[in-house]
Amino acid sequence: MEIKTVSIIGLGALGILFGNQLAKRLPKENVRIIADENRVERYKKDGVYCSGERCDFHYVTPEELCEPADLIIFAVKINGLQDAIRSVKNHVGENTVIISALNGITSEAIIGEAYGMDKVLYCVAQGMDAVKVGNKLTYDNMGMLVIGDKEPGVVSEKTKAVAAFFEKYGVPYEVDQNMPKRQWGKFMLNVGVNQTVAVFKSNYNEVQKNGPARDMMIAAMKEVIILSEKEGVNLTEEDLNYWLQVLSTLGPNGKPSMAQDVEARRNSEVDLFSGTVLEFGKKQDVQTPVNLELFDRIRAIESEY
């Protein structure tokens, strides 16, 4: 199989970043940005910018009939996932491959419920330090999309096809043969970094240097390691150090999505991070006091909007 057409839903940081990369290299009609009519009007009127450059996107509404896409990329926030699943319906065909760049460890299963797990590859977006303000995105590091199969040790034809597509069009990627562990690792990083930077109302620099914020972040991450052992994923101290190394590559003035949400007075993905940790803690009878504190503090910030 060869991937020639891609549909992207969600023009947040990731959607703009990777959408722009592909739109500049493929025929315009081969990269479709799915958005409702109001959004399309706004995007066309105000523009969407990536590092100062106006993106030349081809927009389609969910209602428009079209040929199925070879690849669909979900780049929405978790609270927009159900709407997005409905919106891509006309783009899903028999041989469509779906990847989800969402945070957390649940979106693949939710998409798979709607369209079949046989269409879904696992994906982790990591290493980008993009900041989006309004319709303008800036970044120092593009990061990469890590893709692979649900089953450890397997590299399917779908994975090979997506890898070849990314290779051809300059999307930084990696194939991982243990995606469940990679997803839990990224989840661990998000639980630490996203929440701590949001609570301290700061930037990556706050958790890259030694101090109370970094201590809190690592303590929150260590609670995820304990839960991963109970869930059979078995993250280790080595994994913690790998993700701290990823963190050290990010531009110090950049901010994770949750800190950007708090700054813009939007409800955050706290349920996806400490909320999920608290659920797993309850299920496994494991105390997670640091994540409980982060959860309460972020909820308190949101209650003041």
Describe the residue ranges of each PLM region.
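NAD(P)+-binding Rossmann beta1-loop-alpha1 motif at the extreme N-terminus of oxidoreductases
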Residues: 1-57
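Internal alpha-helical scaffold of NAD(P)-dependent oxidoreductase catalytic cores
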Residues: 91, 114-119, 134-237
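Short, charged/polar "capping" segments at the starts of alpha-helices
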Residues: 39-44, 108-109, 155
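Residues at the C-termini of beta-strands that transition into short coil/loop
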Residues: 35-37, 61-63, 102, 124, ...
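Short, well-ordered alpha-helices that flank and scaffold nucleotide-derived cofactor binding pockets
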Residues: 20, 24, 86-90, 113, ...
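Rossmann-like NAD(P)(H) cofactor-binding subdomain of soluble oxidoreductases
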Residues: 52-136
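NAD(P)-dependent Rossmann-like dehydrogenase/reductase catalytic/cofactor-binding core
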Residues: 2, 29, 157-160, 167, ...
